[in-house]
Amino acid sequence: MSDRQQVTNAKGERIAIVAGLRTPFAKQATAFHGVSALDMGKMVVNELLARSELDPKLIEQLVYGQVVQMPAAPNIAREIVLGTGMNVSTDAYSVTRACATSFQSAVNVAESIMTGNIEIGIAGGADSSSVLPIGVSKKLAHALVDLNKARSFGQKLQIFRRLGIKDLLPVPPAVAEYSTGLSMGQTAEQMAKTYNISRADQDALAHRSHTLASETWASGHLRDEVMVAHVPPYKQFIDRDNNIRENSVLESYAKLRPAFDKQHGTVTAANSTPLTDGASAIILMSEGRAKALGYQPIGYIKSYAFSAIDVWQDMLMGPSYATPLALKRAGMELEDLTLIEMHEAFAAQTLANMQMFASKKFAEEKLGRNRAIGEIDMSKFNVLGGSLAYGHPFAATGTRLITQVCRELKRRGGGTGLTTACAAGGLGVAMIVEVE
């Protein structure tokens, strides 16, 4: 049996990435303060349809993701369909796979096209760190349920007497893993220590990311893939990412204190992604349908793979496990790629994965391979800057990476590109695209 992955429909047509778009990414409580993930999702899908001049009624499926979900609208995908002029009968459902969420939505739509169930679909994701589901304590939640059942005033009074002042305080969304209690930052610290990744190297990668992202915005390359977002009360707008350090100076990174291990740590706010608001989306079609409608796709999906590893150690090493699977399914080696886009959750996590890509020992012991995945050529790596600069709205990053690498390959005359990311829960994803 062949290891090659057939990312085609029954007619042998490839899965075309017709267009992609995102909002600017904004740091928490700045430009998108008070704007929900749902509103950002509707905003970007509406604009994507308008720019591509695609009739919303032609969309047969929309798969959309959100990591920090709002109880008021648990199926963000369905609400986007209802808010963007698509047929009410359009199939829509929501997914979540932590930081790999919009990779998952893209794969789900692609697989619907591969099976012949649809020919046109939209995938993407949105997250807001500014509009959050603030919860209540377990004791207060328990008491509120009991209050709903209580009949007399006396019964209600007895329930209230069980509560202390602390029980009445709001509870923000958890930032730690449910199964381990470890935060992403703590895991990044562990990886930095395990693989001897210095503070200087982390700061240098962050500086590189900000410098390249600033240069990319100055070049105008992102103008066609980032919309201008007008936000309520519509007296202001945001037209570019606001986390990027313009005129980044390497020496300034050393001034920040460690964020997670105050005494011996090396992970800081400057070499980590900030909490970010934003949304992104892509249009996928069968190759034949895209041609029939007169579109010139920005790329095609060549292969993809997901991975899962232990959550106690090296939880953010997902790219090192998913990438060799995607390469094998594409019939490629790392050196065959034109560009590599790796999600930079933390500089420490990114550098640890780069180190494992080049490690024969890791390949033999963890992957069952007799050779390393390969040494990453930095002239191919995150050439426009990465998440450390752009920011990371959890569910939006995947389709941001896909669009960005496809459009950059197009500017360079074509080729193949790897997009890969780690995700909470020990998850990983890799997708290879080809561009003509």
Curated annotation (Swiss-Prot):
Catalysed reactions listed for this entry? an acyl-CoA + acetyl-CoA = a 3-oxoacyl-CoA + CoA
Enzyme class (EC, first level)? transferase
Q: Which GO terms describe its biological process?
A: fatty acid beta-oxidation
Which GO CC annotations does the UniProt entry carry? cytosol
Describe the protein's quaternary organization and the partners it interacts with. Heterotetramer of two alpha chains (FadJ) and two beta chains (FadI).
The UniProt entry's sequence similarity note says: Belongs to the thiolase-like superfamily. Thiolase family.
Q: What is this protein called?
A: 3-ketoacyl-CoA thiolase
Gene source species: Shewanella baltica (strain OS155 / ATCC BAA-1091)
